[in-house]
Amino acid sequence: TLNGAFNEMANFNGMAALETPEFMLSKMDEFGSPESYNHYAVGWAWAMDTPYQWTKQVASHWGGTRNGTIVHWPTGIQEQGGLRTQFCHVIDVAPTILEAAGLPEPIQVNGVTQSPMEGASMLYSFNQADEPERHEVQYFEMFGNRGIYYKGWSAVTKHRTPWQMVGQKMVAFGDDIWELYDGSKDWSQAHDLSKEMPDLLHKLQRQFLIEATQYNALPLDDRQVERLLPQTAGRPTLIQGDSQQFFPGMGRLSESSVVSIKNKSFSVTAEVEMGSQPANGVIIAQGGKFGGWSVYAKDGKLKFTYNVLGIHEFPT
């Protein structure tokens, strides 16, 4: 968000305007505490990604994906405090742990046949700093921001700006402008070589399509909040109808596992066994301190509270 947020859910619910500068100042001492669900302002987020371009969600550029990693294994790594430059990806972590433990890749987990792991173990680099890297190709994609790493080179395109969640004019994927960087000389992606080396750029663009096809990243989808709803995202709607029954002992249910009551009136009916003492406790709740509602008993009286994003509560 441009100005940051005390409660990120306000932005997701189209109510960022409720967090006025005066409100933010009044909460200053609570930022970073359990009372906040805060979100960095764009300027600070970008500054913390220096010297890379862009921020999270912009998976095309290193500012949206690249992070330092510390591996601690006193009995397995001979050198102390060494650095490694081989390209690695988060999908390499599990293969690395399995190889280090001398375990095979699991074929089944809890009776479910597993897809083959797509990463490459990093173990070879732990005691061989100059060993050629083994993870040579990797695609990236998020909300249409996409790119590919290929043997030190990266071809990337920023499709949408993450903090413009409403009203952003989207260009066609085919009209996105691609950039080309030589990671062996320009690790911060500062010097675009796309105009000097168009043939290599086209080769890497084609390689992106090959990788994205192989690993089910197509078709590209640049929607954001629309993905939260199964109906608009294209996922199966697990709950049909306009009512749902719950029973004692049921644990936490995800939002897509319960009937949607967004932007509509609703009623709750509960059968409760009362003891001899005044009842206290939650009967049913959805959400929490950062937004939601709850039906509960307090001192033997039935209560209902609607919490607007932690900014205001409407109790009855």
Kindly give the residue locations of the regions a language model identified.
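Active-site regions of oxyanion-processing enzymes, predominantly non-cytosolic
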Residues: 1-8, 62, 125-126, 137, ...
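Histidine-centered active-site microenvironments of extracellular/periplasmic hydrolases
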Residues: 1-73, 79, 161, 165-168, ...
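Short, solvent-exposed loop/turn and secondary-structure capping segments
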Residues: 2-12, 80-81, 99, 109, ...
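Structured segments of extracytoplasmic/periplasmic soluble domains
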Residues: 5, 9-12, 96-104, 125, ...
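C-terminal cap/loop subdomain of S1 sulfatases and analogous C-terminal strand-loop tails that border
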Residues: 34-62, 77-86, 91-183
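Long, internal low-complexity/basic segments
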Residues: 93, 145, 155, 161, ...
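Glycan-recognition/cleft segments
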Residues: 282-303
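Short, aromatic/His-centered strand-loop micro-motif at the edge of beta-sheets
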Residues: 306-316
